[in-house]
Amino acid sequence: MSDGAVVRALVLEAPRRLVVRQYRLPRIGDDDALVRVEACGLCGTDHEQYTGELAGGFAFVPGHETVGTIAAIGPRAEQRWGVSAGDRVAVEVFQSCRQCANCRGGEYRRCVRHGLADMYGFIPVDREPGLWGGYAEYQYLAPDSMVLRVAGDLSPEVATLFNPLGAGIRWGVTIPETKPGDVVAVLGPGIRGLCAAAAAKGAGAGFVMVTGLGPRDADRLALAAQFGADLAVDVAIDDPVAALTEQTGGLADVVVDVTAKAPAAFAQAIALARPAGTVVVAGTRGVGSGAPGFSPDVVVFKELRVLGALGVDATAYRAALDLLVSGRYPFASLPRRCVRLEGAEDLLATMAGERDGVPPIHGVLTP
């Protein structure tokens, strides 16, 4: 498509106001690129943006799990990223200046130049060229973008799992240093919970338990065994501490809490950890929500290691793409709902619990 051609994008102008706007494609220079979006995965962040629970600088084009084909690329960008026009790529949410101490140390989530302000799917449209997210037919890639090549035999829809699976690998294995034989408990059976279970089992965990809550999680818990779980527990029915102890004779070496808007889950994560165990907290609770039932003294008496987890890095993303290509787990057959631009609002409302029916485990926008 030529420079100046008109393309469509979905713009979130305000909470629950998602509209189609037209944008002209920018001229690509030596250091930037343009991606034809084939698929963009949706997660909890997307529906929190949609409802306004996650405050943003309206208006913006959402979408931070983009997979697409390079439509145009400058020569220096081609050399920097190691990709060419026609290659399928996954676009990381963070940008990296590649120069500050954080970026040189691999912590580009904390890039001094970009940080959280320049995440794809969050940048206001009044910053040219406006096409800063995956809810669009084309997405602009700035010079400091981070992209990964996607194998040609991996469908774009499945490839969008590079993001949640990368999170599962980093949160469930890398950060807690999960070892072969470890007992791992994953709280939350959403896409990132299933991915964390798969990653832990893939790293050699001896036993993996996944927990959920009530009918909304029933289908997800039923899938857990296909993604590495040895035990799935509905905490509305059974005590997860008792269930894990019965199966393993003890508590978890590693607990990964990926629940969202579930304040009481943190106390449960602490209860599930063995003395000197590790608890990774990746699910956010919302400002001011607190942690009902949590006593800091338990952390002291059990000498727990409690670690926060923010985002993913290139190492985990590459491992995720390799795992997807391997076919070890049935990610391709995950129950997913794919929609065009016109169907995005209904899908987001469903994921936010504002429509009848159970939200899909994997939501994908295919512009």
Swiss-Prot record:
Which residues of this UniProt protein bind Zn(2+) 1?
43, 64, 163
Q: Which cofactor does it need?
A: Zn(2+)
E.C. number, please?
1.1.1.1
User: Could you give a GO molecular-function term held by this entry?
Assistant: zinc ion binding
Transmembrane domains' residue ranges: none
- Catalysed reaction equations from the record: a primary alcohol + NAD(+) = an aldehyde + NADH + H(+); a secondary alcohol + NAD(+) = a ketone + NADH + H(+)
Note describing how the cofactor binds: Binds 2 Zn(2+) ions per subunit.
Q: Which Pfam families match?
A: ADH_N, ADH_zinc_N
Sequence positions that bind Zn(2+) 2: 97, 100, 103, 111
Q: Which UniProt keywords apply?
A: Metal-binding, NAD, Oxidoreductase, Zinc
| Family that this chain belongs to | Belongs to the zinc-containing alcohol dehydrogenase family.
Looking up PANTHER family in the UniProt record yields: L-THREONINE 3-DEHYDROGENASE
Misc remark? Was identified as a high-confidence drug target.
Name of the featured protein: Probable alcohol dehydrogenase adh
